[in-house]
């Protein structure tokens, strides 16, 4: 099989992924800084469709209006990758990455900071960056990750008030986008913890519930990340299925994670391989049309010689899993096993003829054979082993 990616695969990378220098709380950088234009060029050569970037990654925090207007970095990124691939991640709008985005003042977050003046300046800054995204990036969307929106102490934050302020901030952004006539939507990225002890909107479910309380919920969706949901011990494909069901999967971050621990950002497929298989199967069967975006970090043990193969491995692993999932679905024995597991019945409404018909149907309760139903096996194990055979290349 040919697992060479093309632009039709819509694979994208954050500039901060291949550009990560290996700096962590316990050690200095192990790689030199990369020029963003070089990152874009190399990713394009590998077959990537586009790039994403943090709001201050190409135009530094504190730049003058004139400097922002030039937007040199955004122009380079847009020109060097196939057209229409850009996406501006306004993670700094939430004050997520303090050393890069806002020294000191966002130590308690941005939209939910206890300091009212900090909230005001961060909202204003987010609006300025929206203007930049719309002006310089084709088909822009903005991701909001509230990495510092949270607390370590129960007394430090009234979460109800904090959610009010979070709602207020997103409503202001939605109002501005609507007034300006911008074709732009917001994708909220959940994460349970790190860098804060506990972060607000920690999971896909929390974010989906929050969105329904906003004044313009149609402008907002989610940007789930594999590792973030798995840090909370959750089933990532299930979360994605619910986001798709709600029509709110605006973007997705693919990487690898091995269990409940710190955010590992492994290359895609290098963590929970079974979850990765079911995720690819779901995205492809659902016809998800958005980019397959990789938010990973080449390990700090590696030099630059391994950075680009690591990025290529993300795409290759996705394509291998896509091939394996397609073979699984096309297998006649799998079709038989799916029927034996009665997946077709799950797709049918329980009360197909409505409430009155259900209540009038004696077989639904009065004459229902409990013993016969209890004796039925579900045949899930055979179906799952067939999936394992395909995943492991044994079929």
Swiss-Prot record:
Keywords: Carbohydrate metabolism, Cytoplasm, Isomerase, Magnesium, Metal-binding, Xylose metabolism
One annotated GO molecular function: magnesium ion binding
Keyword match Magnesium: yes
Cellular localization per UniProt: Cytoplasm
SUPFAM superfamilies per UniProt: Xylose isomerase-like
Enzyme class: isomerase
Textual note on the cofactor: Binds 2 magnesium ions per subunit.
Enzyme Commission numbers on file: 5.3.1.5
Catalytic residues as annotated in Swiss-Prot or TrEMBL: 54, 57
GO biological process, any: D-xylose metabolic process
Binding site for Mg(2+) 2: 225, 228, 263, 265
Residues noted as binding Mg(2+) 1 in the record, renumbered to the chain: 189, 225, 253, 295
Family: Belongs to the xylose isomerase family.
Protein name per Swiss-Prot or TrEMBL: Xylose isomerase
Organism annotation: Streptomyces lividans
